[in-house]
Amino acid sequence: MIGKITRRAIFTVVLSCAAASCHLASAASPVLPPPATDESAAPGAALRTAVVAGGCFWGIQDVFEHVKGVVSATSGYAGGTAATAHYEIVSSGTTEHAESVQITYDPTKITYGQLLRVFLTVGHDPTELNRQGPDTGVQYRSVIFYRDAEQQRVAEAYLQQLREAKAFPRPIVTRVAPLPAFYQAEGYHQDYARRHPNDLYIVYNDAPKVTHLQQEFPELYR
């Protein structure tokens, strides 16, 4: 993983290239159709959680913190073991972890399928294999981690729906996988985009995602 200091250095040197890639990243994903299959929730249903991975967790966390119905979004690691759930180890790309975000949401206000629609439209590019933007490695892979059979059913059905509709010009590489556990990332990673809005990495890679969310999903933006 490219560390924070390295990221800043790269984006200072290649500012114009980063600006171009930022606009490309924010505009590349089409607005996707709603999922034909979704979860159900009775009035007064308890809060639920979803875990997704797709590139650096800073930007995905920031996106979902701007979505109505989301109670919290937490950066962390999923796919590996507790022993390797540490930034310096995960960043080596030698663990089974992916940088992930756990989303706690109110299912009476937003559905699991709607969260996936946001994730696949503005959260990241689901056609990028083991990378997102300037970040490369298996720890940046695109994954929907499911907690139960209903989440698995919704995720697999939605990806199949998008493939059949040829919603993207390239094949979708997002995997659907069971969630063994979610491990919260170090404190300095939490709310990084909100706390460091002028960080060049945030400015050129993550802030445009929030703008895209506001433009394409005004009914969900807060």
Where are these regions (language model features)?
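N-terminal export leaders
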Residues: T6-F11
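Flexible coil/turn and secondary-structure edge motifs
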Residues: I2-I5, C17, S21-R222
